[in-house]
Amino acid sequence: MDQDFDSLLLGFNDSDSVQKDPTVPNGLDGSVVDPTIADPTAITARKRRPQVKLTAEKLLSDKGLPYVLKNAHKRIRISSKKNSYDNLSNIIQFYQLWAHELFPKAKFKDFMKICQTVGKTDPVLREYRVSLFRDEMGMSFDVGTRETGQDLERQSPMVEEHVTSAEERPIVADSFAQDKRNVNNVDYDNDEDDDIYHLSYRNRRGRVLDERGNNETVLNNVVPPKEDLDALLKTFRVQGPVGLEENEKKLLLGWLDAHRKMEKGSMTEEDVQLIQSLEEWEMNDIEGQHTHYDLLPGGDEFGVDQDELDAMKEMGF
């Protein structure tokens, strides 16, 4: 009995009976690893395919906006013999084909939304749009023009309010030059530096004030008692514009116009936040009362770029 047990132990300790590595192919030595065979236990990280985005570089390429400027007047056929629906379909078809060729991943509606967002936020595209206005009007920006722009910026706000409409066009040009300097300084955080939208915003706000029978001069001349104004501002901080009467709104707008031109360094943080809240409320109020100025009644989801149209009107188009 003991001899049989000893023979079993000797057989188990034999080198030929040692279990082999299951990952090594049959008939191969486990100490020799073939470099061409992948390790089945290794974890390989799957590389993520880079996502293609619609950027300013793609919009400014040969197939982007320069293609539209070069070929739109050739491809778009507007005939007086056709009705407005057919002419509009011809225009939309051109832009649909162009959008699919430039960025086929997005649908046309999504493409238009992306273009609108990138065009307003990307500094390179903003400078490109300004250069289009500049070339269309034949403006030249030399050193003398920039110096003139700096001198105009040093003028007091009272002088700027009394500038006539004929003298406003050089100011617009100098503000574009200021935008160009801001691009070189890489300061894109303040969207109010974009005079295209700033001028159009003031224009739209002026039209709403005319409808109410009040202009900015009346608002600036309103001098309420300081106690009433402080109480009104405190009420606005707590509950916002809810329940405000028309004369109270005028007082708030007058206070906003007086403090909007002040430097932020001379104001408290609470006043800066209050100005931002008032500007946001004012913009929403103007948008709500100004929908009938849209060119397309009912409008689609994008609406019309009214800011750009107002800027073109300001520049004399």
Swiss-Prot record:
The keyword Cell cycle applies. It comes from the Eukaryota. Keywords: Cell cycle, DNA damage, DNA repair, DNA replication inhibitor, Meiosis, Nucleus. Pfam families: Swi3. It is found in: Nucleus. Transmembrane segments: none annotated. One of its GO terms (cellular component) is nucleus. One of its GO terms (molecular function) is DNA binding. Its main location: nucleus. Residues 16-35 are annotated as: Disordered. One of its GO terms (biological process) is maintenance of DNA repeat elements. Forms a fork protection complex (FPC) with TOF1 which is required for chromosome segregation during meiosis and DNA damage repair. FPC coordinates leading and lagging strand synthesis and moves with the replication fork. FPC stabilizes replication forks in a configuration that is recognized by replication checkpoint sensors and protects stalled replication forks against the fork-releasing activity of RRM3 helicase. Component of the fork protection complex (FPC) consisting of TOF1 and CSM3. Belongs to the CSM3 family. Present with 358 molecules/cell in log phase SD medium. This is Chromosome segregation in meiosis protein 3. The lineage of its organism: Eukaryota, Fungi, Dikarya, Ascomycota, Saccharomycotina. The gene is CSM3.
